[in-house]
């Protein structure tokens, strides 16, 4: 089984075992940041020369009382099953599975210039109304757009950028074989 399948199984199992999935989702995100972003910490937990017991003791000592017991126990399961390396992917899959369960859709919005908060709110409302789902918007600026915005979620892409509009005009001109440029007569 590939890592993606393994991650989905572990994420689904964890989601089924927790009473407060939003809290676990937050904790998993924080743990991935803590345990995988710093090279020395990541190398310690992924090292085959460090015993599982030593890794569990470090987690227990530093995390007991700071995260839910179910999350700490889950980390222990990952260590014992040799799946600790999959934690970042499991965290992503957990969020995807929780979003499905809650009827949420995560949409990436790239724009240039940056959208105003009121525009983001209105765009979220329009998406929610049109697609009958709660949308979580992840907004970023992309100067390559020249102007406008692009919304992506699931397998859908909505382009309202100057670059895409220019592309549509070009396509229409090529299809109709419209002359481009000025015509001069002598």
From Swiss-Prot:
An annotated Gene Ontology molecular function: proton-transporting ATP synthase activity, rotational mechanism
Keywords: ATP synthesis, Cell inner membrane, Cell membrane, CF(1), Hydrogen ion transport, Ion transport, Membrane, Transport
Pfam families in UniProt: OSCP (PF00213)
A single GO cellular-component term on record: proton-transporting ATP synthase complex
Membrane association type: Peripheral membrane protein
Cellular localization per UniProt: Cell inner membrane
The protein's assembly and partners: F-type ATPases have 2 components, F(1) - the catalytic core - and F(0) - the membrane proton channel. F(1) has five subunits: alpha(3), beta(3), gamma(1), delta(1), epsilon(1). F(0) has three main subunits: a(1), b(2) and c(10-14). The alpha and beta chains form an alternating ring which encloses part of the gamma chain. F(1) is attached to F(0) by a central stalk formed by the gamma and epsilon chains, while a peripheral stalk is formed by the delta and b chains.
Function: F(1)F(0) ATP synthase produces ATP from ADP in the presence of a proton or sodium gradient. F-type ATPases consist of two structural domains, F(1) containing the extramembraneous catalytic core and F(0) containing the membrane proton channel, linked together by a central stalk and a peripheral stalk. During catalysis, ATP synthesis in the catalytic domain of F(1) is coupled via a rotary mechanism of the central stalk subunits to proton translocation.
Family: Belongs to the ATPase delta chain family.
Stated name of the protein: ATP synthase subunit delta
Record organism: Leptospira borgpetersenii serovar Hardjo-bovis (strain JB197)
């Amino acid at each position: 089984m590939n890592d993606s399948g393994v991650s989905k199984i572990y994420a689904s199992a964890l989601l089924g075992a927790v009473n407060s999935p939003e809290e676990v989702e937050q904790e998993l995100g924080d743990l991935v940041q803590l345990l995988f972003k710093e090279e020395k910490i990541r190398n310690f937990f992924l090292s085959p020369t460090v015993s599982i017991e030593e890794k569990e003791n470090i987690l227990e000592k530093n995390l007991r009382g700071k995260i839910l017991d179910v999350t700490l126990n889950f980390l222990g399961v990952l260590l014992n099953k040799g799946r600790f390396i999959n934690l970042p992917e499991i965290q992503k899959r957990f969020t995807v599975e929780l979003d499905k369960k809650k009827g949420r859709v995560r949409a990436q919005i790239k724009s240039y210039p940056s959208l105003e908060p009121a525009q983001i709110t209105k765009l979220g409302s329009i998406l929610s109304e049109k697609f009958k789902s709660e949308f979580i918007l992840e907004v970023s600026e992309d100067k390559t757009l020249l102007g406008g915005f692009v919304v992506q979620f699931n397998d859908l892409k909505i382009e309202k950028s100057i670059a895409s509009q220019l592309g549509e005009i070009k396509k229409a001109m090529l299809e109709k074989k419209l002359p481009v440029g000025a015509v001069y007569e002598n």
